[in-house]
Amino acid sequence: MATIFDSLISSRLDGTRFSFYNDEEIQQMSVKEIHNPMAYDELNNPTSHGICDESMGVSALDKLSKCKTCGCDSVYCPGHMGHIKLTSTCYNPFTMKLLHSLLKSKCLVCHRLRISPKRIELFEIRLKLIKLGYLVEAEKLSDFNHFSLESIDSAIRILRKKTKGKTNKKEEKEDSEEVEEDKYAAKEALENLIQKEKENREIFYSHISSILQEDTPNESIGNAITVAIRDITKEIMNSVVPSKCPHCDVCNPRIKKDGATKFFQMPLSNRDTKAMLSSHGRIDMRIDISTMGAISEYDEEDDESSGESEVREGDEEQEKKQKYLSPIEVLEHMRRLWDVEDTLLNELFDNYKIFFMNNLLVSQNRFRPESSGGKQSGDDRDYLHAHSAMLTKIINANIAFRRTIELKENLTDDRNLETESEKSKTQQIDLSKTEITSKQVIKAWAELQESVNCYLDSSLAAKLENKEKPGLRQLLERKEGIFRMKMMGKRVNFAGRSVISPDPYISTDQIGVPEFIARTITFPEPAKNIEKLKRCVINGAHKHPGANFIEYPNGERKALENMTLEEKKQSSIIRKWRKIVYRHMQTGDPLLVNRQPTLHKPSIMAHNAIILPKEQTIRMHYSNCKSYNADFDGDEMK
């Protein structure tokens, strides 16, 4: 039966998804490009296009300035994003491992996943079923070939066993008609089994086809889709043929990852080299001239006609060396992989650009407040926030990388270096057109990638000193992150914890609560018992039994902590109250008590509170220890 709420609800939240910002979205969010390495000028004012540019909002500690973008002060200005345009493409440190897996899984010649075509088609159908919510059908589809073939194989084994047995006895028997009848019966049973399996296969495939044609999602699946996609992604990666491509029969070299900054193409093993020479008469050098750019140390003759070149004797030592893969080359590999395997990969990822970064978002000024040296130390200087210092390092590495390339190519001389640098700030350099084999250029790019990694995830830093500085990921994750510390399970008004200690003199249905917890945990009680709540309001926040807040009918909440006694008496006057008093916990209040880990229902039980004025621990009767699986050696309960 429809209710009034059904008519009021116009839409429902079906689900959420997370993705990386692309370059267009970053450009739309940003209010200014940041490329000035100087945060402040000589007069200690924020510089234009600097890391503390006033267009990105006002610092939370600055009570006087106004934001140049919205015109608000530090109280009302939400802050505005900026961006740093990277000189060249950098790797996304959060997807580095996945990028390495894809590089190892693709063929460097035909640019396809080294998985048989039938298995790729099967994975595509299973992914579509999972996206629609038909997880059972997707799992059956993966097992269908296995159980059908196993049943047929078992029948064949039975047939062979019977035939063999009858054949041995045939030498002893004179009558062979019985043997022929058994053979015919076993063969007929096998044919019936195969026909039955074919019919089951056709019925199941028709059911799958109807699901895919209707394209109707299954709504009652919860978050199981995420787990299923994660599992099938691992299955896809485990299905990759180690070296020889099943599509073009070419042996592929191994791709090695060096930390979180570089990829190297290793030389072919001796076994693969012999296999290539025996099957093709040459080593396929299309690995990969079209994408090697200036890094390729191979001769590019005949690459337009056949894409292949024979191994020359003078290049034998060169072939044994590992080759550095630039980000531009890896980007080209991923683009070609997506061109061929887009049906499968688009079901797993947004696109290949999530593995790379051309622009880096800069957070608002209010989230990067400066810190002062302090009056006690006699240092009145302001120091940059840790993230501001990391962003400044990225800008310096960005400029150093650009100048290294410009000097290497002799694009500019000393007189017009600054002018050309200003003109090219918005132009990204294509590394495939530069002599990237230079160790200086590779080192400059590695420093840029390292600085980006430190800012986003300092655990990927190569140097120990950089690992100690918290990046954006460290700001969010683990127990000390803002999600668990500030948002998830925040114990403010209705929860508290302390160490437990035994007390045989309280009842089994009671729990002893220290007074400091009782003053913190409040209960929102409507103003009905006037005299009782009057005393609570007058006692205030620091005297038990008291109150911490008063909530008025319009939703305004007033704290009693800093009120004077006269203000408290004025607030306790009853004038058609309809107020809510957030009073302290008192003896007799029912509580839910829990000891983690919560393994079964008795781990959370209800008790009546007894306020203990001079205690610092939660007091509990011995008989409740078994339910909570607790002992008194320092366990905590809440």
UniProtKB/Swiss-Prot annotation:
SMART domains: RPOLA_N (SM00663). GO terms for cellular component: mitochondrion; plastid; RNA polymerase I complex. GO terms for biological process: DNA-templated transcription. It catalyses: RNA(n) + a ribonucleoside 5'-triphosphate = RNA(n+1) + diphosphate. Its main location: nucleus. Three distinct zinc-containing RNA polymerases are found in eukaryotic nuclei: polymerase I for the ribosomal RNA precursor, polymerase II for the mRNA precursor, and polymerase III for 5S and tRNA genes. It comes from Euplotoides octocarinatus (Freshwater ciliate). This is DNA-directed RNA polymerase I subunit RPA1. Each class of RNA polymerase is assembled from 9 to 14 different polypeptides. This subunit is the largest component of RNA polymerase I. DNA-dependent RNA polymerase catalyzes the transcription of DNA into RNA using the four ribonucleoside triphosphates as substrates. RNA polymerase I is essentially used to transcribe ribosomal DNA units. InterPro entries: DNA-dir_RpoC_beta_prime, RNA_pol_asu, RNA_pol_N, RNA_pol_Rpb1_1, RNA_pol_Rpb1_clamp_domain.
